[in-house]
């Protein structure tokens, strides 16, 4: 599918229209957007706004705080990128927008989207820069000295350059927290609150995520002012276009079952999720020995190696990516049509993030869960949480891959 066909599948009726001022606007031309921003939107490949874009962009441009929930693959990054770019004054080469992401890979991907959509707004091709771990701080300081309008980064590095006085926060207009549920979890919460200490009191705050647990919504009261809320009904929290199945299997037979799957059907690209680094390495080694083109990554790898792996997978040079939950959030690879949970995720929210790797932007996709006897209860919890049914894998499942 071409970029021009990017219309997200999330249903109009999936949203809780519980707040005034949230109404779908079915055309980018009808939104309050600069002409040069519209040029960038259409040049990027968007034609018709997705459901979340129809609802979130206009409230974003009005300058108030916003909490927006949208499933993976439904145009969430485009929604906040467009809203953010409309809010900035490109006559001034000052830092005005800050986007925080939980991983280096997601930050790099987000910065690319913002740069491409905003290419006709700025005279500088470098108006949007990334600030992430695994790179030299001195390089970041040089970027800031040269002038940046939008900074996209991970909390640790952004906090560092703020404390050094290199990233001046007084001119900031907008803060976006992408994958907000992860950003406000225990792992990042302290860093996020530390960054907030340096931000202008009147800064616009926008939260975007596929899941918005109640505890996260409760936390937002600490730093948001009467936000517009665009939330998805719980029963809608499963991806259209994704067929979900399970295979009952004993732990020691999972690898053989995996090999059988790859011999049964032709798969464009696939992602296999396992819960430990050791298991990721083991699965990748066994698949490589069977002449599959396999990449693998996990959080303990150097960030430069992880970036190289993602580039290899995106380019199609590698057909299989074996990983931990590191890439479960937001990494956009267009040709993935099957996701295999070699291990079920320990976190129910991560199930949705994982299966969102397949069937993006309305294409068919399949999610297959390997379920041992001890996993049955967790599978039922996932079904109950998302009001969905996960059926046993049928013999003719190749039909679900569009074969």
Curated annotation (Swiss-Prot):
The reaction(s) this protein catalyses: ATP + H2O = ADP + phosphate + H(+)
UniProt: ATP binding residues: 70-77
UniProt GO molecular function: ATP binding; ATP hydrolysis activity; RNA binding; RNA helicase activity; translation initiation factor activity
Record domain Helicase ATP-binding: where: 57-230
Chain intervals for the UniProt region annotation (Disordered): 1-29
Segments carrying motif Q motif: 26-54
Catalytic EC class: hydrolase
Domain Helicase C-terminal stretches: 241-401
Keywords of this entry: ATP-binding, Helicase, Hydrolase, Initiation factor, Nucleotide-binding, Protein biosynthesis, RNA-binding
Segments carrying motif DEAD box: 178-181
CDD domains listed in its UniProt record: DEADc_EIF4A, SF2_C_DEAD
GO CC terms of this entry: cytosol
E.C. numbers: 3.6.4.13
Function: ATP-dependent RNA helicase which is a subunit of the eIF4F complex involved in cap recognition and is required for mRNA binding to ribosome. In the current model of translation initiation, eIF4A unwinds RNA secondary structures in the 5'-UTR of mRNAs which is necessary to allow efficient binding of the small ribosomal subunit, and subsequent scanning for the initiator codon.
Subunit and interaction comment: eIF4F is a multi-subunit complex, the composition of which varies with external and internal environmental conditions. It is composed of at least EIF4A, EIF4E and EIF4G.
Similarity annotation: Belongs to the DEAD box helicase family. eIF4A subfamily.
The protein, known as: Probable eukaryotic initiation factor 4A
Organism whose genome encodes this protein: Leishmania braziliensis
């Amino acid at each position: 599918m071409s970029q021009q066909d990017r219309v997200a599948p999330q249903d109009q009726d999936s949203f809780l229209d519980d707040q005034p001022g949230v109404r779908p606007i079915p055309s980018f031309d009808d939104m309050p957007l600069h002409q040069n921003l519209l040029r960038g939107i259409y040049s990027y490949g968007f034609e018709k706004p997705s459901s979340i874009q129809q609802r979130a962009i206009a409230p974003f441009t009005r300058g108030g705080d916003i909490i927006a929930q949208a499933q993976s693959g439904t145009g969430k990054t485009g929604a906040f990128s467009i809203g953010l770019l409309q809010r900035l004054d490109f006559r001034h080469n000052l830092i005005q927008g800050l986007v925080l992401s939980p991983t280096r890979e997601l930050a790099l991907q987000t910065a690319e989207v913002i740069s491409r959509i905003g290419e006709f707004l700025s005279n500088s091709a470098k108006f949007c820069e990334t600030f992430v771990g695994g790179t030299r701080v001195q390089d970041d300081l040089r970027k800031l000295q040269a002038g940046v309008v939008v900074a996209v980064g991970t909390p640790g590095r952004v906090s560092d350059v703020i404390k050094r006085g290199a990233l001046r926060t007084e001119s900031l207009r907008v803060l976006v927290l992408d994958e907000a549920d992860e950003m406000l979890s225990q792992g990042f919460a302290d860093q996020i609150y530390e960054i907030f200490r340096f931000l202008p009191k009147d800064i616009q705050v926008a939260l975007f995520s596929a899941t918005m647990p109640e505890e996260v919504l409760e936390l937002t009261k600490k730093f948001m002012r009467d936000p517009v809320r665009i939330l998805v009904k719980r029963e809608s929290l499963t991806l259209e276009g994704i067929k979900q199945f399970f295979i009952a299997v004993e732990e020691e037979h999972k690898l053989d079952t995996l090999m059988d799957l790859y011999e049964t059907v032709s798969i464009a690209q696939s992602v296999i999720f396992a819960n430990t680094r050791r298991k990721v390495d083991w699965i990748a080694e066994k698949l490589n020995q069977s002449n599959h083109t396999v990449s693998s990554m996990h959080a303990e790898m150097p960030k430069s190696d992880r970036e190289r792996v993602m580039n290899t997978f995106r380019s199609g040079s590698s057909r299989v990516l074996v990983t931990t939950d590191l890439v479960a959030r937001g990494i956009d690879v267009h040709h993935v049509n099957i996701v295999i949970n070699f291990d079920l995720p320990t976190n129910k929210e991560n199930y949705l993030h994982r299966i969102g790797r397949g069937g993006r932007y309305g294409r068919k996709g399949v999610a297959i869960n390997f379920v041992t006897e001890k996993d049955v209860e967790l599978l039922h919890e996932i079904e109950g949480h998302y009001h969905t049914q996960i059926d046993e894998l049928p013999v003719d499942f190749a039909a679900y891959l569009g074969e």
